[in-house]
From Swiss-Prot:
The chain crosses the membrane at residues 6-26. Pfam families: FAD_binding_6 (PF00970), NAD_binding_1 (PF00175). NADH-cytochrome b5 reductases are involved in desaturation and elongation of fatty acids, cholesterol biosynthesis and drug metabolism. One of its GO terms (molecular function) is FAD binding. It comes from the Eukaryota. Its EC number is 1.6.2.2. FAD binds at residues 135-165, 174-209. Belongs to the flavoprotein pyridine nucleotide cytochrome reductase family. This is NADH-cytochrome b5 reductase 2. Its cofactor is FAD. It is found in: Membrane.
Length: 304
């Protein structure tokens, strides 16, 4: 009997060790090996330096911000956005933006932002506070990022988790058919989503994009959108509408209408989801009323 007296102790120690190892493995399962995440706390501010600025169109620029190291990723789930904040003329200004760079991108994050200059739009003579501030930043200047934020997260393979409001629990929504209406810079969260879907061979979600702009030169990221549609013709459909189209324009013209939605987006159904992002008047007076008219239930629509 003496020879076997230590067996229970050995077994107990082994069990504890196995449990600790399992807990460590589970704790690390959600982390990306070798990829430190920048946005670790959604309530914290992360000062990031401007490392590049590129003109995209007459009033739109791409701003590149450096992450803490060349190995860092931003850490932004698909469907979420970041907040940028800065003291401008003594006041704290906060704006939400969706990066156009992938969350697989290491070392930097790209934002495409339309700059609203002073004395251009008579309704807004002061222009955009944050966009003009960003435009005035010099390489090396720092601005605070905070996130992830947002009510929608795309989990992949057609599965969305959507919160009705900030205090509610997220509800699962499955969509085989994803209709997307974007206006102007509202294309950025849509590109993030479409890019993610088409980059996953296991994701068969079909995407239908209706993209509204004022003029042809205002169409942001057109080359990339058309390249994605060309490479995935069975999965991505792309259509435009312009307020002021050129003479040889082959797409639609004017505000988003019920006929455009009916023709170019998936019909109402249990596996259809419609996402919208753009100027509030477009959502309130063009998109939502026409979706209601066509019988899309509120549970199948979401506005960023």
């Amino acid at each position: 009997m003496e020879a076997f007296s230590g067996t229970p102790v050995v077994v107990a120690v082994a069990a504890v060790a196995a449990t600790v190892l399992l807990l460590l493995l589970l704790r690390g399962a959600g982390r990306r090996p070798g990829r430190p995440v920048t946005l670790r706390d959604p309530q914290a501010k992360y000062p990031l330096p401007l490392v590049g600025k590129e003109e995209i169109s007459h009033d739109t620029k791409k701003f590149r911000f450096g992450l803490p190291s060349p190995d860092h990723v931003l850490g932004l789930p698909v469907g979420q956005h970041v907040y940028l904040s800065a003291k401008i003329n003594g006041n704290l200004v906060i704006r939400a933006y969706t990066p156009v760079s992938s969350d697989e991108t290491k070392g930097y994050v790209d934002l495409i932002i339309k700059v609203y200059y002073k004395n251009v739009n008579p309704k807004f003579p002061e222009g955009g506070k944050m966009s003009q501030y960003l435009d005035s930043m010099k390489i090396g200047d720092v601005i605070d990022f905070r996130g992830p934020n947002g009510l929608l997260v795309y989990k992949g393979s057609g599965t969305f988790m959507i919160k009705p409001d900030k205090k509610s629990e997220a509800q699962r929504k499955f969509a085989k058919h994803l209709g997307v209406i974007a206006g102007g810079t509202g294309i950025t969260p849509m590109l993030q989503l479409i890019r993610h879907i088409t980059s996953d061979p296991k994701d068969s979600t079909k995407c239908y994009l209706l993209f509204a702009n004022q003029t042809e030169k205002d169409i942001l990221l057109r080359a990339e959108l058309e390249d994605i549609a060309k490479r995935h013709p069975d999965q991505v459909r792309l259509w435009y509408t312009l307020d002021r189209p050129p003479q040889d324009w082959k797409y639609s013209s004017g505000f988003v209408t019920a006929d455009m939605i009916k023709t170019h987006l998936p019909p109402p159904g249990g596996e259809t989801l419609i996402l919208m992002c753009g100027p509030p008047p477009m959502i309130q007076f063009a998109c939502q009323p026409n979706l209601d008219k066509l019988g899309y239930p509120k549970s199948s629509t979401f506005s960023y």
